[in-house]
């Protein structure tokens, strides 16, 4: 039995990652799910949040927003609308986006504006959380 699985993360613009890993945790729209080698095949929609993977005793973090995860034959394929490695996240930009989203939320005139501002706030917070988790884990280079 295989003990590793291949993780591939792809966006419309680029291949973000292709690497053998021990474990993958991802934000599904119904909640987080985890995948290890020899997992049963499945397909899941992705939410906004932090995908993480374990490689030996190190944990790496990648911000993802939207898309799908496909699991099968010891391979996890993430087709994400947005995927950013922790090292690529600009903290100042994410903080600015957070403040802007909070201001938009406070001024929202209807449910649509409110939902858009809430989604922007969720993305900004997830980016900041991703960067923070990677720094705490000492894996900001991935």
UniProtKB/Swiss-Prot annotation:
Superkingdom of origin: Bacteria
Topological category with respect to the lipid bilayer: Peripheral membrane protein
Main subcellular location: membrane
Keywords, in A-Z order: ATP synthesis, Cell inner membrane, Cell membrane, CF(1), Hydrogen ion transport, Ion transport, Membrane, Transport
InterPro entries (UniProt xref): ATP_F1_dsu/esu_C_sf, ATP_synth_F1_dsu/esu, ATP_synth_F1_dsu/esu_N, ATP_synth_F1_esu_C, ATPsynth_dsu/esu_N
Function (record text): Produces ATP from ADP in the presence of a proton gradient across the membrane.
Protein name: ATP synthase epsilon chain
Organism field: Maridesulfovibrio salexigens (strain ATCC 14822 / DSM 2638 / NCIMB 8403 / VKM B-1763)
């Amino acid at each position: 039995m295989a003990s590793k699985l291949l993780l591939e993360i792809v966006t419309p613009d680029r291949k973000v990652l292709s690497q053998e890993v021990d474990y993958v945790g991802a934000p599904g729209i119904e909640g987080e799910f985890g995948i290890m080698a020899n997992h049963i095949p499945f397909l899941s929609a992705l939410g906004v949040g932090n995908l993480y993977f374990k490689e030996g005793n190190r944990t790496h973090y990648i911000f993802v927003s939207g898309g799908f995860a496909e699991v099968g034959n010891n391979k996890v394929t993430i087709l994400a609308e947005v995927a950013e490695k922790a090292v690529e996240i600009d903290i100042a930009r994410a903080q600015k986006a957070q403040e802007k989203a909070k201001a938009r939320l406070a001024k929202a005139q209807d449910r649509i504006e409110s939902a858009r501002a809430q989604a922007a706030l969720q993305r900004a917070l997830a980016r900041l959380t991703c960067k923070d988790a990677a720094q705490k884990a000492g894996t900001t280079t991935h």
